[in-house]
């Protein structure tokens, strides 16, 4: 067996399948594009669904890839098992209606066992198969596999409801008796017992049936196009070929673990306690790649996943004695390990480090908040006489604050309390069930649309034309092809067309189709790409359309030109964002309509008003320079050498179009653009907002719409000027400033009157002094307009020796506000208010001499005041 690095394994995999006529599909971004069923790209086939469901026909039906993926369903298992990861690489080979079982099995066995390739010992390989799948069994036998190494397993059948399905055959590597301490042997495989001896390294799915839940599997009908979908985990193959005890002892993780050793001063012992090392090494890989792909930590969706991963890693760092921010220092190591195939981590290292470090520092403050919450929970338990911290509260600490259960247990036991472990497990399971239920399972092969997929007639888009005479080659209506149509809605393909099919954020052209007599026979309401790339015109039929006849196609010129202005402005906006906000602000989505443009981009905070103004000014400067917009067609390598930006989520062929706006912007783009920036006229940002964790959106308008937006603002300003009786618009700021000064003076006068009223009221409050166990205290409900007045009471109380402790409560606008002040060394105001606040259904905290709380139960204010004496 060869000793190969992970990079060598990956490259050998791709080289082997290339030798079998496969095209290499680059690893896609971890953030799915146009797939709401997935939170993350979670498998090698996830990015290829468009090929298997027939919506896109691949140039080559044989595909191979090495795809980075993220799965976080069972995050708690990371580090506890030898092979569980949140981020992993899936090696795959796929056939879309091309080769099937025989080639998949024969070639797979060749790759694994041939001395030219992986050279794994044949006697160490075992295969499982579906019992009724005799063809796979016979094919393995034909390859030379011993019958004793072929294990029938009833679960070896892939199906998710109705649709494509089929048997699968899995390949396992036997690591020997060393990993079978109970000497169970082959029963580990036969009975599907969790073990570390037989390691699954590859799964081959044979999609050949159309599943129908209403009939038994034996009656499933065969698919017209059979497919192959396989997956082999790079981490597992590396562990096997490097002789590593676990995946974590491979060259994919050990450099990270060595850095953690240096930071912690502790040694990684494979035979000892290694959990924290493994969790940190795993999680920083996910963080580095996901942030590099545009996801950012947040409170929902992908952002929540990343925040949780980071917080778990930080807490495990604390277990190793690392108290300062440290995860960000591991990013370069992750980048260096993966650089040969994934250079983007090192390319974006500074940005990734910045995000991780900032999140670590924020979490350090959050830990303090978690400690405060735990203190409050324990204080309430003590007051109620209970001795057990409830599972739901432990889970809230764990889930919201990232507090490990062990830390909660340790601190609670120090205070004499027990832990409700079962309640915590129940809350955890409930959350996991919710998470799993929210994932829409998407298989590799969707329903096949044969009618559209079988359209092979060519169609050419005429970039420069707005009208064209062209032959009608295809009519589709009611999901079937027709020779003619004279009413209703239909899908049309022409040999040539001036109509732009929606793509790359640019909306489709609209327009008309006329016959030889000049009569309009159809109106084009949409244009999309057919599976084989043709422009598929959706039309409302108004006359007769016949396949083979010639028609005049004419786009809506005004609509096209307005869309082009917005599309070119989008390129200018993208470049301005790079210049002003940073290179990390890359496109995450766009829409170029005729009335507006919408641009989504990755950024970790709101764009400031100053930045928005600078962006707007820079874009307009480029417009007013009247720069020519040039478009060339070239190969992808030449385009990249020109510095052209390739946009995330876009699929590029061998030939690409490069759109250049002077030396200001160079992008790969298949859309239509103005010939000169001066045609755009004017650019105005109308809105900037967040649309999700780490993603911002800018709405903008150009040309006439920009002018109208400025007019609307001017009209509003004129209305304000009239109200303020300002004769000129430029005098409005001075008028507003004058009103603000008057308002400030009145507020100051009002505050003075409040202070005098408070002083008068305080005289009565401070007379009501009580004593309990040697502590003099004042506990009173007061009538005030805001919480600030309570602090005014406290300030006056401090000026004289009225009492040792002051407790004030007020009912202000449907809420209860409580203040505790203390001059006594024996009474901690912060601790006292934590005990009192729950009485009014509130919470709070503070320092030894001053604390405040808020609550909602005004009916219990007197109960709170009565409880003060019991605390001394």
Swiss-Prot record:
Binds 1 zinc ion per subunit. GO terms for biological process: alanyl-tRNA aminoacylation. Its cofactor is Zn(2+). Zn(2+) binds at residues 567, 571, 669, 673. Keywords: Aminoacyl-tRNA synthetase, ATP-binding, Cytoplasm, Ligase, Metal-binding, Nucleotide-binding, Protein biosynthesis, RNA-binding, tRNA-binding, Zinc. InterPro entries: aa-tRNA-synth_II/BPL/LPL (IPR045864), Ala-tRNA-lgiase_IIc (IPR002318), Ala-tRNA-ligase_IIc_anticod-bd (IPR018162), Ala-tRNA-synth_IIc_core (IPR018165), Ala-tRNA-synth_IIc_N (IPR018164), Ala-tRNA_ligase (IPR050058), Ala_tRNA_ligase_euk/bac (IPR023033), DHHA1_dom (IPR003156). It is found in: Cytoplasm. The keyword Aminoacyl-tRNA synthetase applies. GO terms for cellular component: cytosol. It is an enzyme of class 6 (ligase). The keyword Nucleotide-binding applies. Belongs to the class-II aminoacyl-tRNA synthetase family. Catalyzes the attachment of alanine to tRNA(Ala) in a two-step reaction: alanine is first activated by ATP to form Ala-AMP and then transferred to the acceptor end of tRNA(Ala). Also edits incorrectly charged Ser-tRNA(Ala) and Gly-tRNA(Ala) via its editing domain. This is Alanine--tRNA ligase. It comes from Streptococcus thermophilus (strain ATCC BAA-491 / LMD-9). The lineage of its organism: Bacteria, Bacillati, Bacillota, Bacilli, Lactobacillales.
